[in-house]
C-alpha cells in the first residue's frame, strides 16, 4: 500500500534553477519540501553555461529568491552585447544594446556547475527548516500512482515517496514529463543541439582584450557561412577568468546538412574574428554537449498533470529567438509560480487546484507569450529556410558597398533590437 511510503508535502525533482526556485519559494511558505537531485553533486549532471537574466517584468528573479546570488554564484555582469554576421572574410557587426537591455534589470554570465552547487547549499538550508532537505545521487525514474492518480515518485535508490505536490524540474529528458504524457516533442525540428567549450583566460586578459571593466563583461553572437548552411549560430560569453564559447543549431538542420557540431564549433574557434581575443592559442578546460527544446514549438501550454507541475526544460521553456537566448530565468519564474500556485490552492482548501492555477499564472505573467509568440506562426516557413541569413549575407556582400552596408545594416540592427520583429523572425 502507498500509505506505507514516506510522505512529504512537496517533492521537487531536480536542483537546477527551476527546481531551486520552486523549493526556495515553497520553503518560504513553510511547505515541507524534499528535493531529489540525480547528480552526486548538484551541477555535476549539467554541462551548460550561459546568461541568466533578471527581467523587470518577471514576478521572480533568482536574486530575489537567493540573496547573495550575484556575489557568490555568478561570473560577470554582461553589459555589452553584439552579433557578428560573417560571409567569407567579411563581417558586419550589430550592436544589440537595445534588445539586451529591453526588460532587463541585470544579466550575468554563469557556469552551471558552480551555480547549481551553490544553489543546492542554499536550498538544503531552507528546506531542512521545513522538515525536508536535498538528497543528491537519487535518480527519479517515474511517477507513483494509486487508482490511476499521481500520488508521488519512484526512484532507483529509494522506496517510492508520496507527495501532495510534485515539481518536475528534471531537465530536457524529463522522466516525469514523459511518464505523465506531457512531453510530446519528438521531431528533430523541435530541438536544438548545443555544444560548448570553456576556454581558460585570466581575468585581467579578458578585461584588456574585450575592453570591459573589472566588474563588467560582454556577449558576442555569430552567424553566417562559417556554419556551412546549418541553421543556428555561435556565442561567446566572458566569465570571471574563462570564456564560454559554443554553438546552438537546429537538430533537423544538422541532420539535413550532415554536419558535425564539434566541427562547426572548431570553425568558430579557428575563425580570424575570434583570434583577436584568443590570439593564436587557447586551452579548453571543458567540452560539453546538450539538447535543448525549442519553446516556439514545444513550450507546453498546460504543463501539469494531477499533482505534477513541470518547469524549465522539462516543460519546453527555453526561449531562442534570434539573438534572444533565455532559459534559466524562465525556469526560475516557472518554479516560483508553481510554488505560488500550490500555496494559493492550499489557501483555497483544494491542493488539486495547483496545476490549473500554475497554468493560469504562466499566462497572466506573460511567460507563455514570450515562449510561444503568436507572430512566429505567421513567418515560420520564411525564417526556417535560411532567408534571414541570406539577407544578412547579401548585406555584407552588397554591390552598393559601404553605402549599402550603412543603409541595410542599419535596418537589420533595428530589427535585431525590436522585440516585436524578433517574435516574427526568431531564427538568424
Report the location of each language-model feature.
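N-terminal Rossmann-like FAD-binding beta1-loop-alpha1 element of flavoenzymes
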Residues: 5-35
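Predominantly flavin-linked oxidoreductase catalytic cores and closely associated redox partners
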Residues: 122-274
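FAD/FMN-dependent oxidoreductases across multiple families
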Residues: 227-230, 240, 253-336, 350-352
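C-terminal helical "tail/cap" subdomain of flavin- and related membrane-associated enzymes
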Residues: 343-428
Amino acid at each position: 500500500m502507498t500509505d506505507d511510503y514516506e510522505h512529504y508535502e512537496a517533492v521537487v525533482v531536480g536542483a537546477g534553477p527551476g527546481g531551486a526556485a520552486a523549493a526556495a519559494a515553497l520553503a518560504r511558505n513553510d511547505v515541507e519540501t524534499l528535493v531529489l537531485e540525480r547528480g552526486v553533486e548538484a551541477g555535476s549532471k549539467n554541462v551548460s553555461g550561459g546568461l541568466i537574466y533578471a527581467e523587470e517584468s518577471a514576478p521572480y528573479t533568482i536574486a530575489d529568491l537567493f540573496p547573495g546570488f550575484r556575489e557568490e554564484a555568478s561570473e560577470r555582469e554582461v553589459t555589452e552585447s553584439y552579433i557578428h554576421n560573417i560571409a567569407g572574410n567579411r563581417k558586419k557587426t550589430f550592436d544589440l544594446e537595445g534588445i539586451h537591455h529591453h526588460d532587463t534589470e541585470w544579466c550575468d554570465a554563469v557556469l552551471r556547475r558552480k551555480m547549481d552547487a551553490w544553489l543546492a547549499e542554499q536550498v538544503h538550508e531552507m528546506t531542512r527548516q521545513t522538515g525536508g532537505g536535498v538528497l543528491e545521487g537519487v535518480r527519479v525514474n517515474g511517477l507513483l500512482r494509486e487508482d490511476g492518480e499521481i500520488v508521488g515518485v519512484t526512484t532507483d535508490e529509494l522506496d517510492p515517496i508520496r507527495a501532495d505536490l510534485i515539481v518536475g524540474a528534471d531537465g530536457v529528458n524529463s522522466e516525469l514529463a514523459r511518464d505523465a504524457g506531457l512531453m510530446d516533442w519528438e521531431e528533430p525540428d523541435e530541438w536544438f543541439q548545443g555544444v560548448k567549450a570553456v576556454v581558460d583566460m585570466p581575468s585581467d586578459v579578458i578585461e584588456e582584450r574585450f575592453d570591459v571593466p573589472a566588474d563588467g563583461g560582454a556577449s558576442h553572437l555569430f552567424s553566417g557561412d562559417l556554419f556551412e548552411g546549418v541553421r543556428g549560430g555561435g556565442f561567446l560569453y566572458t566569465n570571471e577568468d574563462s570564456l564560454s564559447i559554443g554553438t546552438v543549431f537546429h537538430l533537423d538542420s544538422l541532420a539535413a546538412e550532415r554536419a558535425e557540431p564539434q566541427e562547426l564549433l572548431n570553425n568558430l574557434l579557428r575563425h580570424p574574428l575570434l583570434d583577436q581575443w584568443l590570439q593564436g592559442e587557447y586551452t579548453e578546460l571543458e567540452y560539453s554537449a546538450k539538447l535543448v527544446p525549442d519553446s516556439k514549438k514545444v513550450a507546453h501550454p498546460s504543463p501539469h498533470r494531477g499533482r505534477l507541475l513541470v518547469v524549465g526544460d522539462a516543460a519546453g521553456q527555453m526561449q531562442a529567438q534570434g539573438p534572444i537566448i533565455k532559459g534559466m530565468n524562465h525556469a526560475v519564474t516557472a518554479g516560483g509560480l508553481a510554488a505560488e500556485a500550490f500555496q494559493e490552492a492550499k489557501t483555497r482548501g483544494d491542493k488539486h487546484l495547483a496545476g490549473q492555477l500554475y497554468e493560469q499564472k504562466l499566462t497572466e505573467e506573460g511567460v507563455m507569450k514570450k515562449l510561444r509568440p503568436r507572430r512566429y506562426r505567421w513567418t515560420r516557413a520564411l525564417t526556417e529556410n535560411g532567408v534571414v541569413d541570406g539577407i544578412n549575407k547579401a548585406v555584407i556582400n552588397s554591390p552598393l558597398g559601404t553605402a549599402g552596408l550603412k543603409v541595410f545594416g542599419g535596418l537589420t540592427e533595428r530589427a535585431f533590437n525590436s522585440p516585436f520583429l524578433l517574435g516574427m523572425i526568431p531564427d538568424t
